[in-house]
Amino acid sequence: MRKIYLNFLFITLSLSLFSSSIDNNIIERELKVHKTPTCGCCKKWIEYMTNEGYTVSAEDHENLDKIKKFYGITPAYRSCHTAVSSNGYVFEGHIPSRYIEKFLKEKIPNAIGLSVPGMPLGSPGMEFGDRKMTYDVLILFKDGSSEVFATVSK
């Protein structure tokens, strides 16, 4: 009986340790996108993110200024849509999914999210044939500052 109990205890502890190590590596893949009702490139970015394995819901607004201001996105960092993860991070604009995943894994102190300001040609949702431009993915910080997180080349 004691051997059964010890085996049970060992299995329980092993599963507990295993599941906690798995939980630390899970990337949150749920986004709520705030956009205007007529924006076609926003719809394309949502489709792209869905194809990348994200669960995406969209909410249409006639004016996004209040939402962007609420989430701390100053005018210099704005784009046509604002995505918010279930854990509160913001992803402004046409950000490639690989950088969102990298950002979520790194857990950068004082960061509120990422931004691709404007609508760079060739970014996800802004495809136009073979035309592409180089652009930066910025980390946005609580104090309103930013720094380059990645540069996406042609």
Summary of predicted features, one role per range:
Residues 7-16:
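Bacterial N-terminal signal peptides
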Residues 34-36, 59, 94, 117:
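Active-site-proximal beta-strand/loop segments in catalytic clefts of secreted hydrolases
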Residues 76-154:
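Thiol/selenol-based redox catalytic cores and closely related redox-interacting motifs
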Residues 1-6:
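Positively charged n-region of N-terminal signal peptides that target proteins for export
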Residues 24-52:
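Local sequence-structure signature of Cys/Sec-based thiol-disulfide redox active-site neighborhoods
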Residues 46-87, 93:
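N-terminal, post-signal-peptide region of Sec/Tat-exported proteins
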Residues 15-25:
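Bacterial Sec-dependent signal peptides at the C-terminal "C-region" and cleavage site
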